[in-house]
Amino acid sequence: METGGLPLELWRMILAYLHLPDLGRCSLVCRAWYELILSLDSTRWRQLCLGCTECRHPNWPNQPDVEPESWREAFKQHYLASKTWTKNALDLESSICFSLFRRKKERRTLSVGPGHEFDSLGSALAMASLYDRIVLFPGVYEEQGEIILKVPVEIVGQGKLGEVALLASIDQHCSTTRVCNLVFMPAWFSPIMYKTTSGHIQFDNCNFENGHIQVHGPGTCQVKFCTFKNTHVFLHNVPLCMLENCEFVGSENNCVTVEGHPSADKNWAYKYLLGLIKSSPIFLPAEDHDFLMSLDLESRDQAWSPRTCDIVIEGSQSPTSPVCSSPKPGSKEAEVGSDGERVAQTPDSSDGGLSPSGEDEDDEQLTYRLSYQVQGPRPVLGGSFLGPPLPGASIQLPSCLVLNSLHQELQKDKEAMALASSVQGCLIRKCLFRDGKGGVFVCSYGRAKMEGNVFRNLTYAVRCIHNSKIVMLRNDIYRCRASGIFLRLEGGGLIAGNNIYHNAEAGVDIRKKSNPLILCNQIHHGLRSGIVVLGNGKGVIRNNQIFSNKEAGIYILYHGNPIVSGNHIFKGRAAGIAVNENGKGLITENVIRENQWGGVDIRRGGVPILRSNLICFGYSDGVVVGDEGKGLIEGNTIYANKGCGVWMMSSSLPHVTSNHVSYNGLYGVAVFSQKDGEFPGGHGAQENFSEDGDAILWEAELEKEDDPLRRPITVALVESNSINHNGASGIFVQSSEALQVVANVIHANGDRGITIVQSSQLTRVANNSISCNRQSGVKVEFQCKVELRGNGIYDNRGHGIITKGDGTAVVENDIIGNRGSGLQLLPRSDTKVLKNRIHSFRAYGIAVRGRVKALVQENIIFQGKTNKTIFQQITNNRECIMQNNKFLVFKKKSDTWRLVNPPARPHLENSLRGSSAAHSGHKVTAMATRITARVEGGYHSNRSIFCTIL
């Protein structure tokens, strides 16, 4: 365009009057004209697109108010798609070479209607030739018999959509046909409006009402800008079919049924449809900014170092036994003076009380140094949460816990990327399914891909059964009266990037050996659970946001066995994850937070592997193991829940190992004997998992799979955990079953380290480090059977051990530096005290209160203050037998005692066995530090808060 010509605005005004062919010719003049034609996007191109009777708004029906990125591009895509049906025209010529010289046959236009050439569609078809155009003028046309299409034709309605109605049953026998701008209704003799078995059919801008459309492979179809009212589209063995920008309303059955494996025989249109799909804008999601980095849980080994414990006076040390005054790297020193820190709360009267702190005080300051390094859990998810939570502060997840975007996940997972990119069977894109029974039903090895659709107000959105596969990308599924997506009988595929919410049943229902990949979805505000896996269902549930559901975020039962990893499950009105009725599952590296009930609830035969999860800020308990619950609970961070960290019933058999349980409002780990049936309200309402109202006998479908990650246990086992800074006791036991508490670090809890109030069978407490708790290290109540062996009980603000148990054994423990007595035996207790090392600064090494049956033998008892006795006995008790004990008294201020041969307990490296040894490389240093502030929170009742589950 030459300089000095017309202004651009005037050129645009002139060009706005041109028709489509003229615009195309002008764009070929030169680059300046080409750019000028492109600049008409929001004016002339928009006008052409919206004025075309063969199409509608490019974003109809889901977003008709949102303009496309380019009106010209949208019009171009529709124009190219509208010509697909004629692509085989050259195939009909006998010779491509001769066709170049043969005179091209002109397409005829046949008019049908009152006052026109033909009165009916049937009569026009009888006279039609190849690729003729049949125009139906406004009116209602009813065919009394089935119409057989034998030659390729184009059937178009004249005028606005709705002005031409056709009541017919058409059977296509030709290679290709196009139908545009018609309202289809079934004839009186058949519900089938259109059927093809081998050819290609293209529908543009049509309405279908109250009938059926059938396409059988190797036939293909291409449907765009159509409305289906109570109409069923049946696709059987189709190799490829496209449904784009369509609306399905009020179906009494399924809107679309895709049945059978895609046919290996393909007609001529297959390659053109495939090319059209690949040339259209890629629908794979771009990178999101609300999902960031993935989890990095690489563990780091920590070398073992020996424990040391030195007791000195005034800091002076023996020249023959030097003690380093500075702590070793990676260790912590705790010093307690004779006046020391005040005990914030005096132990209750049943504990026997402490000696008055002001009585017989020495001016000399007595101190001890305690330096030790112990094994705890491996590095845990959410390590930045290990400090005290700030009251009222908003929860900010560290960057390592923010979810990946779908784009990042697909880049990482090549199999998922291949699924997302595949096109086979039926492609349903940008369609609206509403106000009916079913959306899409895929069965009998069928294949379907759904992108960018909206499913709303249906009974269900998608069903996938009988070895079928679906790919669902970026769909909205909401207000379904049952489950949103339903998979059974080995259904599978990829469900990624969808928004699934406000459904009456589960957002996704997986059962009967179905095995989908559920990736990067938002599943929220459901009236029941977010995802349900049952009846031997499997699946990989990864990197999803599951929140604000009325029941469990993920519910696993009846031998469901999914892999649940890297999800954020939060703000649910029940449990985060529930595993019931013999459910299984590998649950790993999830963030489970702010749920109303337990973060994870395991009961009634549930046996999951719960590993490396962050379970935090719950309004009840972190992990609940109810009646007959089992499973491996390993390497989790259970933090700042208002109830207990782990709540267990004595009838359960979990293996709780290598967890970090801290800053929970009540007990760190609590074991109760109360049955579920005694809870108010029982279990609550049970979810209806039957299909179509029929009872399902899942027990007949058991899968016997040996899982190498699980080791069978016959006694509930709590081992190798770090349990610290919880509001009440670190471990609370009220159990009627046997229990083992082994190799744990129990530190700085708001009450006692371990409280055992009921233990009718043996509770074994071995090789634990119990330190700096606000009251006593261990308390054993009346008639409890307890064995305390190999523990290190240090620097607790009450007594070291208090017992009135019946059959308590205190063997080979180090009870050092506690504010009260090292060991206090209360009336009616029956205790064996063997081979312990006991020391107390302010009180007695061993205090016997009242009539006690005890055997105190071969213990080493260190003197505290020089004017205190080592042993105190209130009454003359012949049943308390003292034999072969060694009492060490300070002779001079420079005396130093050191715990050697063996070194300071616990000796954790010797307590590891079984599966714990398999993970012995996963170690972390847990240091005993002085508690400086009381953790707020009341004391637990005899049951879990809201521990039952719907």
Swiss-Prot record:
Classification lineage: Eukaryota, Metazoa, Chordata, Craniata, Vertebrata
Organism: Mus musculus
InterPro entries, per database record: Beta_helix (IPR039448), Carb-bd_sugar_hydrolysis-dom (IPR006633), F-box-like_dom_sf (IPR036047), F-box_dom (IPR001810), NosD_dom (IPR007742), Para_beta_helix_rpt-2 (IPR022441), PbH1 (IPR006626), Pectin_lyas_fold (IPR012334)
Protein known as: F-box only protein 10
The protein's assembly and partners: Component of the SCF(FBXO10) complex consisting of CUL1, SKP1 and FBXO10. Interacts with BCL2. Interacts with PRDM1.
Gene, per the UniProt record: Fbxo10
Matches recorded under PANTHER family: F-BOX ONLY PROTEIN (PTHR22990), F-BOX ONLY PROTEIN 10 (PTHR22990:SF15)
Modified-residue entries (Phosphoserine), positions: 321, 326
Effects seen without this gene: FBXO10 deletion has no detectable effect on B-cells in bone marrow or spleen. Similarly, it has no detectable effect on T-cell thymic development or T-cell splenic maturation.
Region Disordered, residue ranges: 313-364
